[in-house]
């Protein structure tokens, strides 16, 4: 796969806030599983969810100078099959993520 450009930290932060939102986001366990599946090191699982995700994404980008595995994580997090029983949550997350991804 071709290297995708790094994302600005402001975009990463807001994506992390969407994905790890207390009410509508992934659980800590889900975040850990998806980080492992995307081959991104979980740098500090004791932090709040969005900070944990932000630090993992930032470390990945700083080391690899691309956003490939972050995009893999997001693709896995938003797979429609994960939302068969809750299509409204899928629509919400997709809408919120796209608001930030349009800046990339």
Stretches with model-predicted labels:
Residues 1-104:
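Charged interaction/catalytic cores of defense and host-pathogen modules
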